[in-house]
Amino acid sequence: MMKKNKPTVAQTLSPEEEQAKFFEEAKNNVMIQGHHMKLSLDNSKLMDALKYASNIINELRTSLLSPKSYYALYLVAFDYLQYLNTYLYEEKHGKKMIELYEVVQHAGNVLPRLYLLITVGSVYIKTKQAPAKDVLKDLIEMCRGVQHPTRGLFLRHYLSEVTKDKLPDIDSSVENGTVMDSIDFIIQNFTETNKLWVRMQHQAPTKDRERRENERLELRLLVGKNLSRLAQLDGVDQKTYSEVVLPKVVEQIINCKDKIAQQYLMEILIQVFPDEFHLATLDIILQTCAQLQSGVDVKTIIASLIDRLANFATRNADLVPDNIKIFDIFFNNVKEIIQARPNMELQDILGLHVSLLNLTLKCYPTNKDNANEVLGLCQSIIVNKAKEDINKPTCVKQIIQLLQIPLDVFKNVLVVLKLSNYQPLISCLSYNNRKKVSLDIVNNTINNSTIIEEPEAVNNLLETIQTLIKDEQDQPDMDDIDKEDFQEEQNKVASLIHLFDSEDPEKLFKIYIIARGHFGKGGPHRIRHTLVPLVFCSLRFIRNFKQQVDSGVISLDENKWIAIGSKIFTFVSETIKALADIKLADLSFRLYLQALQTFDHCGLVSRVKELAIKALLIFQEDIADFKAQVMALQLLISTLNSLSIPNEEIYESLAAQTIKQASRLLLPQDQAKLISTCSHLFWVDNPSRQYQNPDSVLQALKKALSIISNESSPGLGTFVDILNECLFYCDKETDAVPIQFVSDLVELIRTTHVKEADPALPYLQNTIKYIQSQNYKGISI
């Protein structure tokens, strides 16, 4: 019984595998034919070699290979043809070039015929057996015979490669050809090459269009090399470029109406020719950009040109003719291009503005109007765009860059704020981005230590960074804002106040009023940070002002001084009150005391009493924590003790109020300690003021002792505190505190309140040692 054969299944290759197979077959054939060609040449069999060379080129007639694979095959074939080229030039083959030139024209197929013609023709030119211009003209015309996009493209590339060192230039004889002949040859080849490259898009079905476009891009150098050849000709000077080369090149770029070709060719045009040429033909290039297809990325083209010319003008300012206004040309053309392209992406529009701004600040750093024009044009475009477009990350990045560039270049916020279109551009951003820009402005001001002397400039700055200063409609809820970041931002804003300064006191006070007006809108979360330094700067201001008056720098009579002091008092008082109104009691209390000392130093006594009363009022109504009350009273006593109030009635009234508040403290120990401390209010021994009231001193100490003695568990520490206060007056050798009173107090402590476990016992022992060391008369230990 016969076995049945298993049916064979045809193996299906993937497109990539199939392509690799076709390429390997073609390459192997080329290498086989190339091997035979070399053997024939080595044996001086030229006609056989030409036959094998024709066979090599026949492999390039294929339509099975992708452009990428075809390119690889072309390179293999090119190497063999170069071998033939070298042989024809170097070997004695017994034939004239004119004969060979005619022989190869009888090759059977068009493509091998033309490759061989070009190969022989290049040697024909090199051996100078025929004028270059005639051979080049003949070859360029014959290449029209191949209109297949891929085959024609590589044929013309071969023509360009093998003739590149044989083109007539400035040192050529007239008979051989001139540089104009070379220009005509290259431009004609460029035009036809580009047409073939553009036609490649139609070789693939619609569904494969994207793949074909990518393959086309891989071959772009074959077209661009023609422009490189033009740029390498020594005979192409600026005049020739402007009048001959550029018009023909841009005509082809515009007429091809292909976005890929237009994009690449404009980019390569800008790359290969010198900056001086572009400078002289700027209008033509930009007008060409305006005529490109809508899908062309003109932003990249123009930005590249701007960057190149900006760098050139910076390095070679003396080479830029006065009649060429680079910025004006770019600005006007860019504006027209944007208007002519209503569908142009916003990020591309913004990118052009960034390039324009960099251009003007590099080429015309002192011309602020140009920068302002760029910002103004940008702002006028943005206001008509949808918010979702403006807030795209790419667009936001460009806008912020536009706003950052002037800060980085000028390093002076005063210069930047004179750009009238700067602030309106900020307002186009979302809250978080406005805040970021505002922080950049603040950081720039601080880092460069920019002193702001004019009220108008201060107002302009604070209006510009208003996102940091007050609540805005589009800001997130305070609960959603990072507290540490917020505090850091507000601290930076507050530090600006120290950069507001002027030698003119009137201007400086006006600056503080303006700052207060802006900061006052900040709400409770902000003013706790911003108003405090404003208070201190205002107090420093009145001290300095008083010093100038006293030294005669400023001439002012007493009444005028009091009037000015009253204005500053009102300003400071209202500023502190704003903090008190948001329940910052402890802070407000301390600021009132600071102000109290300052106004006392300046001799404004009536204001001292008002400030002390305000401080006492806050103490009574708003400081509830008993520990905070103790600390506040200690601070108040110290402050009052340092004053130089000449009016004893006012001073004694304040001292009495202080004792009254001390007697209202929660804990008897605190009452006694603070009242004993109040005794110092009646014994002032300062260089600026002498005031002693022995009766009041003793009365305060007795009152303190009475309070603590009535406690069931008074504790030793408070008694020792009172004893130490008494010793202070003994050391002053005053009769305010009788020795007998001190002696009785010591005895009372030793007999009644000393317990072995009391933590204050070492305190008492040290005090006793001190008494013993001083040998007070009348105090027995």
UniProtKB/Swiss-Prot annotation:
Gene Ontology CC: cytosol; endosome membrane; late endosome; pathogen-containing vacuole; retromer complex; retromer, cargo-selective complex
Keyword tags: Endosome, Membrane, Protein transport, Transport
Pfam families: Vps35
Origin: domain of life: Eukaryota
Localization (cell): Membrane; Endosome membrane
Topology versus the membrane: Peripheral membrane protein
GO process terms (BP): intracellular protein transport; protein retention in Golgi apparatus; retrograde transport, endosome to Golgi
Keyword ATP-binding: no
Keyword flag Protein transport: yes
Main location as per UniProt: membrane
Coiled-coil ranges (or none): none
Record-linked InterPro entries: Vps35, Vps35_C
Function description: Plays a role in vesicular protein sorting. Component of the membrane-associated retromer complex which is essential in endosome-to-Golgi retrograde transport. The vps29-vps26-vps35 subcomplex may be involved in cargo selection.
UniProt subunit comment: Component of a retromer subcomplex consisting of vps29, vps26 and vps35.
Entry's family note: Belongs to the VPS35 family.
Name of the protein this chain belongs to: Vacuolar protein sorting-associated protein 35
Organism: Dictyostelium discoideum (Social amoeba)
Gene: vps35
